[in-house]
């Protein structure tokens, strides 16, 4: 797979992962909100039972409360089981996205290694040119020294 295709696939999967992560977080928040609202509803219902003057209505309301709490408990457990399955799937998805990203990183390192080889060659040529220039300068300085040493100048 060529680099641009790999990068395109990575970016696409990363966007999809981000979207799924947001959706998973939203599910968690909604379940929490349902739990909070339900808890408040049941507390209020329980406290209002004492406001009944009619025993029969109070008993029926208490029975309805009990049935509603049981129904709620089944529903919330089902939601929590579904939510618990989200995390492993999301983690496996993230693993795949990270692996793809790291393949891109490996390709980038390979490109850097190629660049290093080119820079090394350029540096070798530069050092060679500098050594030649230094040698020429040394010869020139030596010739100047010889001219000073010659008598009559």
Label each region the model flagged.
Residues 30-110:
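Extended amphipathic alpha-helical interaction segments
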Residues 7-15, 58-66, 110-117:
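Short, charged, amphipathic alpha-helical segments
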Residues 3, 7, 35, 44-48, ...:
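Glutamate identity and glutamate-enriched acidic tracts
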Residues 20, 24-27, 68-86, 123-137:
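Extended alpha-helical coiled-coil scaffold domains characteristic of the BAR superfamily
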Residues 87-153:
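Long amphipathic all-alpha helical oligomerization modules
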Residues 1-29, 34:
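N-terminal Sec/ER secretory leader and immediately downstream segment
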């Amino acid at each position: 797979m060529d680099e641009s295709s790999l990068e395109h696939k990575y970016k696409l999967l990363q966007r999809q992962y981000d979207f799924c992560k947001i959706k998973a977080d939203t599910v968690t928040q909604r379940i929490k909100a349902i739990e909070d609202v339900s808890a408040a509803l049941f507390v209020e219902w329980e406290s209002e039972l004492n406001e009944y003057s009619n025993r029969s209505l109070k008993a029926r309301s208490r029975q309805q409360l009990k049935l509603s709490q049981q129904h709620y408990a089944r529903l919330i457990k089902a939601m929590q089981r579904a939510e618990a399955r989200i995390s492993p799937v999301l983690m496996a998805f993230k693993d795949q996205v990270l692996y793809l990203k790291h393949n891109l990183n490996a390709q980038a390192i390979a490109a850097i290694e190629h660049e290093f080889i080119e820079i090394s060659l350029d540096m070798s040529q530069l050092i060679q040119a500098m050594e030649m220039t230094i040698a020429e300068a040394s010869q020139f300085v030596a010739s100047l020294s010889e001219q000073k040493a010659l008598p009559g100048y």
